């Protein structure tokens, strides 16, 4: 993977810059790195599911029985260079899935599941023609949290406290203008 200085590392197949989602760099046995999306596409069209040929040098990488390409080792050197934390991307059928985890347990927001469609299922190819372009769409997960959970959120608490302080300050300011005006000018 020859990189020019000043450029972000990119996948040599699709030329997209590496990231920690669907373009996570994965290392093959030959030490070449490719994004997980390209490797998933290659593994789905390869006749032998257990052997994955490197697109650059054609060196085979043997996968364990039932092991998806998402379980290949991540190129942590590239992620460290990009200052990114690795995310766990899984391959389910013809879709790459990423579950977005909240950073803090105090910040209660809905986790999202992002999927990347890698093409039609082999059984559905005989039916209606489908759009084979990859699409990334967030799928919100339903929540059972109530308004009570919203009040436990520290960001909401800080916002509510600041609004209360601003309201009290405004009321005191208006009251002080009334009292000062009455006291000095005798207007009433």
Swiss-Prot record:
Residue ranges in the Cytoplasmic topological domain are 1-157
Q: Name one GO biological process term.
A: apoptotic process
Q: So what does this thing catalyse?
A: S-ubiquitinyl-[E2 ubiquitin-conjugating enzyme]-L-cysteine + [acceptor protein]-L-lysine = [E2 ubiquitin-conjugating enzyme]-L-cysteine + N(6)-ubiquitinyl-[acceptor protein]-L-lysine
Q: In which pathway does it act?
A: Protein modification; protein ubiquitination
Give start-end positions of each zinc finger (RING-type).
11-58
Topological domain spans for side Lumenal: 179-188
Keywords (alphabetical) are: Apoptosis, Endoplasmic reticulum, Golgi apparatus, Lysosome, Membrane, Metal-binding, Transferase, Transmembrane, Transmembrane helix, Ubl conjugation, Ubl conjugation pathway, Zinc, Zinc-finger
Pfam families assigned: zf-RING_2
Q: How does it sit in the membrane?
A: Single-pass type IV membrane protein
What does the UniProt PTM comment say about this protein? Answer: Autoubiquitinated (in vitro).
Q: Name one GO cellular component term.
A: endoplasmic reticulum membrane
Q: Which SMART domains match?
A: RING
What SUPFAM superfamilies has UniProt attached to this entry? RING/U-box
Look up keyword Endoplasmic reticulum and say if it applies: yes
Q: What class of enzyme is it?
A: transferase
Tell me the PANTHER family matching this sequence.
Answer: E3 UBIQUITIN-PROTEIN LIGASE RNF183, RING-TYPE DOMAIN-CONTAINING PROTEIN
Kindly state the subunit structure of this protein.
Interacts with FATE1. Interacts with SEC16A. Interacts with BCL2L1.
Would you tell me the protein name for this molecule?
A: E3 ubiquitin-protein ligase RNF183
